[in-house]
Regions:
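Conserved GNAT-fold acetyl-CoA-binding loop/helix
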Residues: 1-12, 23
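A short gly/proline-enriched turn/hairpin at secondary-structure junctions
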Residues: 1-2, 17, 46
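Alpha-helical interaction segments
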Residues: 6, 14-15, 115-116
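Acyl-donor (CoA/ACP) binding surface of acyl/acetyltransferases
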Residues: 11, 24-141
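Short loop/turn motifs at secondary-structure junctions and domain boundaries
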Residues: 15-21
Length: 141
């Protein structure tokens, strides 16, 4: 990504936050402040009326439950602050840890799609506000 492309991406994220109240936010290691990725919400490319959650972390952050912490914060924002009824997410076939993450926070599998110019097979999941609230109640019990 060039500097110009990065600036354009930042501008589009700011515009999305201003118009929809959603964007991708940076993720850092709490102890060191090291940037390790991003997480957030955006309109789903297959249906812009549907909101998709995503977490994208560098390999140095894998396996430390940072993705789970970030995804839970994103879902709390979407459901508790924005009042969204449903949030979707997906992962490429073979990304078993992504599947485990989505299932751990309460997403349920819905269907597979072919995505992008290379028609990558993606497993799609969804979680509704009611399920989100019930999983949070179980965690705090």
């Amino acid at each position: 990504m060039t500097i110009e492309q990065a600036r354009a991406r930042i501008d589009s994220e700011r515009e999305r936050e201003n118009s929809l109240g959603i964007q991708y936010w940076p993720v850092f290691f709490r102890d060191t402040g090291e940037f390790v990725g991003c997480a957030g919400l955006r309109p789903w490319q297959m249906d812009p009326n549907t909101i998709e959650a995503g977490v994208h972390l560098m390999r140095s952050a894998w396996g430390q439950r940072l993705g789970e912490e970030a995804l839970r914060a994103v879902l709390a924002y979407g459901f508790d602050m924005l009042g969204l009824p449903t949030i979707v997410a997906g992962h490429g076939i073979g990304h078993d840890n992504s599947q485990k993450l989505l299932e751990r926070v309460g997403f349920g599998y819905t269907h597979n799609i072919k995505w992008g110019p290379k028609a990558i097979e993606v497993r799609m999941y969804a979680i509704g506000a009611g399920m989100w609230r019930s999983t949070r109640t179980l965690e705090s019990a």
